[in-house]
Amino acid sequence: VRLIRLIPFNMMFVRLSSSYFFYFALLGLISPYLAIFLDGQGFNSRQVGEILAIMTATKIVAPSLWATFADKSARPLFIIRLGALLALVSFSLLYWFSQYWPITFCLALFTLFWTAILPQLEVHTLTSTKQSSKIYARIRLWGSLGFIVLAVVAGETISRLDYQVFTSLGVIILAGLFISTLLLTPKKGGKLNKGKTNAPEPIVNKLIDGRFISFFIAGLLLQISFAPYYGFFALFLRDFDYSGVAVGLFIALGAVAEIIAFIYMGSLFKRFTLNSLLVFSLAITALRWFLMPVVADSGLWLAINQLSHAASFAIYHSASMKFISSHFTKSQQSRGQGVYLGGVYGVGGAVGAYITGLLWLGGEGASNAFIMAGTSALLGAIIMVFSKK
């Protein structure tokens, strides 16, 4: 009953939710199973880590470039649609290549265009919902649902068929994403004054603010910590003889916990400060990674550990978006999102993926990789504890 009340059926909600659904459905395919695909191509752990690092490194600059273009053009929906279309085209190139450098190029090109979508979609959603944390969380949970569906479906499909079905699944999802972006409509009265779009408000003072610097570094460390999970978790579970559907269910369980957290984010924002939510998320994440190699051989304890994804992702992500929304002015939102996603997800993800690739050693160094991850998240928590309130 509560879930039914939480889903307002109006066209704005449906359009935004469908875009989030397909965007994160693709993440539900790529995050767990790209390593399976690359492993099937014959690449070793170091090569897999390098490819993941190169893909993620494109996020360092690309989001800011796309965001600046969006701010100056005042056409965020055009950026979203263009990114979705070009991501579809570039991902489709995987059908024709099987060697290391061509595949690396295709995936890097795909990521370059894919990064154009989420920052603008977040800004468009926050603008359309008038900065309502509750409505945003309800829309965003459909992204989690998309992730769950693909994590389970792809795990079983790849297990039953072949790792090469990965490409076809990605193309289908990206086609759905592109179609969903065509259904998005601009907010009424939301067009910017064209006479002012050529001189966007500077954001340097916002970027050098001590509170933002602490927030940025903590986010960077969190993303470094996620690298073993995002890039190698499916391979990790496969080494413990879990089936394809079991791998998908473990990943989906984390996303279910994430959805529940998103539902209650409005209440959490009323009861706790942003800083306390960020510290809590980082601390729980550190514990999660430290426990991962310890509980991996027990399905029950691994499932319990996966529930902490509610804090690791949902609470931290929602708090981060609220921080960015309040820290930057309306005209700075796209660039603020771009700097955050480019620096935190780009640098953090790339560094984490590269280090994990070096530590993994075909699975023999998995424990060391998760210890590195836990230490990184713990450092992030300490930074936020001493951050300026």
Report the location of each language-model feature.
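Helix-to-loop junctions at the C-terminal end of transmembrane segments
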Residues: 62-75, 158, 261-273, 360-361
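Multi-pass alpha-helical transporter architecture, strongest
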Residues: 95, 176-186, 371-389
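Structural signature of the two symmetry-related core transmembrane helices
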Residues: 78-92, 276-291
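Helix-loop boundary and gating motifs at the non-cytosolic
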Residues: 9-56, 211-250
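A membrane-interface helix-boundary motif in multi-pass transporters
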Residues: 156-173, 358-377
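Hydrophobic core of transmembrane alpha-helices in multi-pass small-molecule transporters
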Residues: 21, 90, 100-117, 220, ...
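Juxtamembrane intracellular "pre-TM" segments in multi-pass secondary transporters
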Residues: 3-9, 185-219
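Cytoplasmic helix-loop-helix junction between adjacent transmembrane helices
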Residues: 108-142
